[in-house]
A protein has these predicted regions:
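Active-site regions of metal-assisted phosphoester/phosphodiester hydrolases
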Residues: 1-114
Length: 114
């Protein structure tokens, strides 16, 4: 993992705080000297549509191209959790396994550096 920078996050439930946190993350990511992976619980109650502008500005894409929900784990309906990746990274597999050890389902992703 020497050739990549990984950010793990758990963003605020409050929209305004979350937007401040995303702005700070954008500043960190825009200065990153290596390819970036950003993953965690984003608490985005509108799913990827809430993340759209941040992702475009930061040059990130979601590994979850099907928009599979991860919350709540027993009957997942919302996409609160993301694995985002930038240029120089290729996703080779992605899944959301049905593991009920948390209120969120896990995200599993394999990637390769290009």
């Amino acid at each position: 993992l020497d050739g990549v920078i990984i950010f793990l996050v758990h963003l605020s439930l409050k929209y305004r705080h979350r937007q401040f946190q995303l702005r700070h993350l954008y500043e960190l990511i825009s200065r990153a000297p290596k390819p970036v992976i950003l993953a965690g619980d984003f608490n985005t109650f509108w799913g990827e549509s809430e993340m759209f502008l941040f992702m475009k500005a930061a040059g990130l894409r979601s590994a979850n191209t099907a928009g599979l929900p991860s919350y709540p784990s027993k009957m997942a309906r919302m996409e609160l959790d993301f694995i985002l990746y930038g240029a120089g990274i290729e996703i080779t597999s992605f899944e959301v396994p049905k593991v009920l050890h948390s209120d969120h389902l896990p995200l599993l992703c394999d990637f390769e550096l290009r």
